């Protein structure tokens, strides 16, 4: 495996399952030091053990992206452990789907806080280290839901907000050698989409089948499809690509 990230440190939020875990694993396989923060202790411990068993340098910490003190401490510890924070992937996410008239204040606030406040806290903490090094890569995970999706007014708003956040940061901190981009997944087979199937009362296979019927490449997405896109933006060779949103959805989106 090519060690294109050797000597680099990738800090991934929500990195113990699904898309996040695929991102962490691919960074590790390609030579990066990896740092994971997550709220799922069981998954975090399992992922950390798997990576260490393979000899990969890894930092794992139970922390909430909505707690700026926890994030600041994690960043400090990662910098002390590995000597830099070069890549930030804002992957942590949550859904609380419901129609507007049924959506509670907590449903709204939880989703907005995890995605937007979380990305704000992590990016603000990371840029302190990146600007000193005159190098950095920040990649935010948006979604095709940013374009609007029934029953997801909170999630759609958060994911659209991340796109605006991405473009603004690209303008603000580009002069410090930092690029900021976003990846917007379409239908990806994860625990989150399994939960969606359960919520609407259909089998996961049926949910996949319905999604695939509308995807031009005639297949569903896998976490590796997203990690491939993330690593493209994280690569040193992508230094002239910033402020972009890449839809990884198996076809054009409207």
Which sequence ranges carry the predicted segments?
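Active-site helix of classical SDR
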Residues: 123, 158, 166
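Substrate-binding pocket helix/loop in short-chain dehydrogenase/reductase
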Residues: 99-100, 107-112, 138, 207, ...
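The beta1-alpha1 cofactor-binding region of Rossmann-like NAD(H)/NADP(H)-dependent oxidoreductases
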Residues: 41-42, 62-73, 105, 225
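Short C-terminal tail/terminal secondary-structure segment
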Residues: 231, 242-254
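Conserved glycine-rich cofactor-binding loop
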Residues: 16-17
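Conserved mid-core segment of classical short-chain dehydrogenase/reductases
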Residues: 72, 95-109, 132, 151-154, ...
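Alpha-helical segment proximal to the catalytic Tyr-Lys
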Residues: 128, 171-175, 239
């Amino acid at each position: 495996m090519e060690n294109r990230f050797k000597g680099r440190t990738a800090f991934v939020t929500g990195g113990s399952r699904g898309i996040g875990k695929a991102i962490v694993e691919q960074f590790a396989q390609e030579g990066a030091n990896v740092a994971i923060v997550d709220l799922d202790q069981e998954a975090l411990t399992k992922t950390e053990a798997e990576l260490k068993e393979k000899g990969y340098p890894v930092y794992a910490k139970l922390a909430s992206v909505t707690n700026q003190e926890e994030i600041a401490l994690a960043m400090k510890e990662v910098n002390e452990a590995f000597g830099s924070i070069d890549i930030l992937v804002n992957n942590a996410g949550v859904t609380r789907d419901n129609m507007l008239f049924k959506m509670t204040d907590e449903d709204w606030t939880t989703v907005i806080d995890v995605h937007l406040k979380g990305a704000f806290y992590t990016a603000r903490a990371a840029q302190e280290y990146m600007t000193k090094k005159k190098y950095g890569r920040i990649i935010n995970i948006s979604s095709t839901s940013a374009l609007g999706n029934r029953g997801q007014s909170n999630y759609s708003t958060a994911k659209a907000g991340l796109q605006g956040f991405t473009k603004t940061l690209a303008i603000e901190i580009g002069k410090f050698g930092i690029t900021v981009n976003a990846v917007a997944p379409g239908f990806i087979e994860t625990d989150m989409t399994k939960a969606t199937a359960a919520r609407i009362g259909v089998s996961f296979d049926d949910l996949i089948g319905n999604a695939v019927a509308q995807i031009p490449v005639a297949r569903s997405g896998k976490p590796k499809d997203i990690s491939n896109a993330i690593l493209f933006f994280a690569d040193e060779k992508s230094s002239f690509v910033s402020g972009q949103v890449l839809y990884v959805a198996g076809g054009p989106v409207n």
